[in-house]
Curated annotation (Swiss-Prot):
The gene is trpD. Mg(2+) 1 binds at S100, E233. Keywords: Amino-acid biosynthesis, Aromatic amino acid biosynthesis, Glycosyltransferase, Magnesium, Metal-binding, Transferase, Tryptophan biosynthesis. One of its GO terms (molecular function) is anthranilate phosphoribosyltransferase activity. This is Anthranilate phosphoribosyltransferase. Mg(2+) 2 binds at D232, E233.
Length: 347
């Protein structure tokens, strides 16, 4: 479609009406092909934001992004077990340690297949990719090498800009608007590995159930969409609102640290810093030398991932498995193995 042919779709939007999934996919296909005027793009994104994006519209935008992504060669040996992503939208306004990224190493060391889709920082000083770079992990490794890492090590990291080149066309508009748009929730939905399982944190409690419905529409098998007392993670400092997708149904409930078998901590205990500082904290956690608050925050998130993958019968049992895995040092060994294997792409 050209910019001229999408005008009828824009007219629907500007009248305050909702688009279908297919119509939204058409609009976003034009955008990521670089064929949409920046003024038109800004108007489209703001029209969606002001009315409030529907499940169909978010799903359609994700469809377009997934279709245009660089393909990821899913290893056949992982298909029977299934793959999980542990990811957050970012944008929660807190500068915490890298909980979900560290949890990915723990879950993988405990037996889960983890394909983590990540980017540079959104709201904190250190996003998942910022952290990984500190350990010498090559973010631009080929899809084939990433697939090998997933098969051999149970873990790979997929750097979003490496797979979704078309997103660059929206960057100037997003920077000019300086407000959240649909793009702020799209990142976790467009993992090129298309994981069967998702632990997805969102920056607002209002997004928990809608994003669970989007995952349902996109065909995700099992998922927990969470918002933890202000964080886009499972919370150690308070309650966590959950929408769990299981057997095609969505169940809503709350979890507290007690449900995981760990004590509550204050949010200030989870404060992070620059990538180098956060890397040191991650290293300490994975070596089994982290402080209790840091270790528990990572374990409860890894525990939920292990529960979703079917490696534990409950989030409490998953947390116990995560804690015991940390003590073995296997997660720290995995960190070094991934750095070594990823460096092959630089040779």
């Amino acid at each position: 479609m050209s910019e001229t042919s999408i005008q009828p779709l824009l007219d629907i939007l500007f009248q305050g009406k909702a688009l279908t999934r297919e119509q939204t996919a058409s609009l976003f296909s034009v955008l990521i092909q670089g064929e949409m005027n920046e003024t038109v793009m800004a108007g489209m994104l703001m029209a969606l934001k002001i009315r409030g994006e529907t499940i169909e519209e978010i799903s359609g935008a994700a469809d377009a992004m997934r279709a245009a992504a660089k393909p990821f060669p899913y290893p056949e040996s992982s298909r029977s077990q299934g793959v999980i992503d542990i990811v957050g939208t970012g944008g929660d306004g807190f500068n915490t340690i890298n909980i979900s990224t560290t949890a990915a190493f723990v879950a993988a060391a405990a037996g889960a297949k983890v394909a983590k889709h990540g980017n540079r920082s959104v709201s904190s000083k250190s996003g998942s990719s910022d952290l990984l770079a500190q350990f010498g992990i090559d973010l631009t490794m080929s899809p084939e090498l990433a697939s090998h890492c997933l098969e051999a090590l149970n873990l790979c990291f997929l750097f979003a800009p490496h797979y979704h080149g078309g997103v660059k066309h929206a960057v100037p508009v997003r920077q000019t608007l300086k407000t959240r748009t649909l793009f702020n929730v799209l990142g976790p939905l467009i993992n090129p590995a298309r994981p069967e399982f998702m632990l997805l944190g969102v920056y607002s409690a209002e997004l928990v159930t809608p994003i669970a419905r989007v995952l349902q529409a996109l065909g995700t098998q099992r998922a927990m969409v969470v918002h933890g007392s202000g964080l886009d993670e499972v919370a150690l400092h308070g309650s966590t609102q959950v929408a769990e997708l299981k057997d095609g149904e969505i169940i809503e409930y709350q979890l507290t640290p007690a449900d995981f078998g760990v004590p509550q901590a204050h949010i200030s205990e989870l404060e992070g810093g620059e990538p180098a500082h956060n890397a040191l904290i991650t290293q300490q956690i994975l070596q089994g030398h982290g402080c209790d608050a840091h270790t528990h925050a990572v374990a409860i998130n890894a525990g939920c991932a292990l529960y979703l993958c079917g490696l534990s019968e409950s989030v409490k049992m998953g947390t116990a498995l995560a804690l015991s895995t940390i003590k073995t040092g296997k997660a720290y060994e995995l960190l070094h193995k991934l750095a070594t294997v990823s460096s092959q792409s630089q040779e």
